[in-house]
Amino acid sequence: MGKVLYSATMSLDGFIAGEGGDMSWLVEYLGPNPTVDDLIGRIGALLVGNRTFRGDDPYKGTTKEGEPFGGGWTGPQFVLTHHAPDTPVPGITFVGDLDSGLAAAKAAAGDKYVNVLGAQTARQCLEAGALDDILVCIAPVLLGDGVRLFERPGGTNVKLERMSLTHTPQVTNLWLRVVR
């Protein structure tokens, strides 16, 4: 069975989305990134939070809008929600809880990664002991407010081990393993 990975681009002050979930800031940091390009080929399924699924898209208004990794990845997607849409969405399975979502995504991913998208879903995976790796692409910008990479008020320390550190002109990539 593959591993569970949370990947996100984050501002230097710790935000993955701006105020109100705004993702437009991300556009200028989406240049070529060999670390992400390599990762995309190793993703077998996505586990997506409902707010991420229904939220802002850095590719809004383009042909890449609504496509994971700007159209760079296709495959099974599992969205955590208590309110699935009435009309089915092709390629997307809506699940009502984390355990069933993780089980379905892991089965679909096989030996590849289940890539988690969404801060709240990543936090839930971490708290459940299901998160294995974290890839943070750190952008050289300060957003000042928004959605944090991890929001864990009153949470305990979680030890991480640095697996790799790479960079592009746009971002610095930090790949971490959750130490158990």
PLM regions and their residue ranges:
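Enzymes that bind and transform nitrogen-containing heteroaromatic metabolites
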Residues: 1-180
